[in-house]
Amino acid sequence: MVLVIRPKGGIGNRLRVVTSYYLKYIKNKDEKLIVIWRWDKFCNGYFQEYFEPIPNVEFRTHNDPTLKINYSGCSRVGPVDFSIIKPLPHIMNKINEKRNLLNNDYIAIHARRTDHISPAEKRGVFTTDEDFFKFIDENINNSSLYVATDNADTYTIFQERYKDKMKFPYHKDTGSYRKTSLEDAIIDIYMCGYAKKFKHSGWSTFSGLINNLRKNLL
């Protein structure tokens, strides 16, 4: 059997779809999964440029008209396990370099902003700057702080408050809808994943991805 899916949305949504379909239909079975991974404003890069191949999974940038797409969207079909996703060596080297610069002694937050604020507020799960300040002040001690965010102004707020704890400048703005590059986003995921402690943003699949990874990384 060949199953064809087209995950949509940002990197968190897409990896959620891929891993759930892989676990339910492909892993430990003689089946094949074809993933149509399109570049768009929500995800500005291709899976195969950043991650190791997954057994029995083929990633394509465009669909073959002769193939029927079995699913297109951002919903999972069962449990997810992001530990099956492995960054390519040159990406992993950058992650480890940053970890080493922090002596692998840091806490992290993911402050999701931009288009996320209104939906999270409507659901009553928006994580405010004050929520993050409280987490940081209670846990920072002598550790460094790593801030993952999709908004430069938000980064500056934390940088001004914790200037002695933050060692890295903000990512270069891509000037597009997705303000950070996919590589930067992937580095953020794993930096947060390896942190001693982590505070997530409510209603964020990106934060959910990190929390899932932390179960296997720590």
PLM segments and residue spans:
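Secretory-pathway luminal glycosyltransferase catalytic domains
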Residues: 4, 38-142
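Short catalytic/ligand-binding loop motif for oxyanion handling, primarily in non-cytosolic enzymes
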Residues: 13, 41-46, 116-119, 153-157, ...
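Short His-Asn-centered micro-motif
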Residues: 5-7, 36-38, 110-111, 147-151, ...
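Conserved aromatic-histidine-acidic binding/catalytic patches
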Residues: 5-13, 124, 146, 179, ...
